[in-house]
Amino acid sequence: MAGKLQDGVAIAKIKETINLFCEYSFGDLVNNRREIVGRVHDARKNAALAWPDLIMNCFLHSASHYGVVKFLLDIALSTRFGDFTLLGVSSQNYPFYDLHVVMTKAFCNLDFAKDEYLMINDSFSSMMSAFLDEEGVHSAMSMELGIHDIEDRFVLRTKRLFYIIHEYHMSLDEIEPWLEKLPDASGGTLLNQKSKEQMRVIFSNAKVRIANSINLYVTTHTNSYNEYVREVAEYVADLWNIQTTTNTQGHENELAAEDFGVLASSSQMNGTKSELGDSVIKSDGNEVKLEPAMFTRNDDEEELAGSEFTSLLSDDGRMG
């Protein structure tokens, strides 16, 4: 794709990406992999060099914000070595004259209110923008350069993902300023506009979901037989101050999970301690439903994961 897109064409392409994030659910990267990877591949191709900016704009908009968070968490939790490339740009062409204007028109065209952007503080907003820009460059891979270092890049990029998710989770302690532009439910909302009350519920759910997923990931992978996945899990445990024990339970959980297509159940999490408090998964009779992207793929799934090389990788990320 070369040159700039006319507004009509650009809006149509942007709408597809907005819908992707508005409709995204936890675990879609695995549970609905064929469709999701295909849609992300198209979105990356359409956005080209603007892919990081497009994700950031969707992150700032209340309608698509949570979808972006779920998408990033799914990539972080994935043990497929190629999934991080979904954040990489597909080419060096910037196809939009003014992305923000096109985004605004696209949201309006989808019947979302014009002024629905979250007022995220400058500190975290700048951090997220810089993160996406960096991943746009460093997560992209070329077959011409080879993929001999895919394991090391998986470790580095996944650590970066978990770090930004940690910072996001911490920032959710003070979300009231983020809601400044959103209306109160008592005053009514326009079209599909979200109210302050709705976003408070979304942020509350996000905190619990992230905390539960992190605990599950650490418990499952700290003793993984895969040294690269284990390195990431140990980093995450340190980052989140989660106490772990060195034994074979994590390895056994991982092997058992592969047999059933999931990595662990809440019952395998009993006794995990961390600074996440009430967000720790418990098995005391109150079942916690989890849907993170921590599943193993079916053997017949050989879809692209952001670049052409991914279909060459086996389930544990090695060439197969």
From Swiss-Prot:
Principal location: virion
Keyword set, alphabetical order: Capsid protein, Host cytoplasm, Outer capsid protein, Virion
Origin superkingdom: Viruses
Membrane-traversing stretches: none
Region of interest (Disordered), residue spans: 297-320
Subcellular location: Virion; Host cytoplasm
InterPro entries named among the record's database cross-references: Phyto_Pns9_10 (IPR008776)
GO cellular component annotations of the record: host cell cytoplasm; viral outer capsid
Key word Lipid metabolism present: no
Family, per entry: Belongs to the phytoreovirus minor outer capsid protein P9 family.
Described function: Minor outer capsid protein.
Name used for this protein in its record: Minor outer capsid protein P9
Gene source species: Rice gall dwarf virus
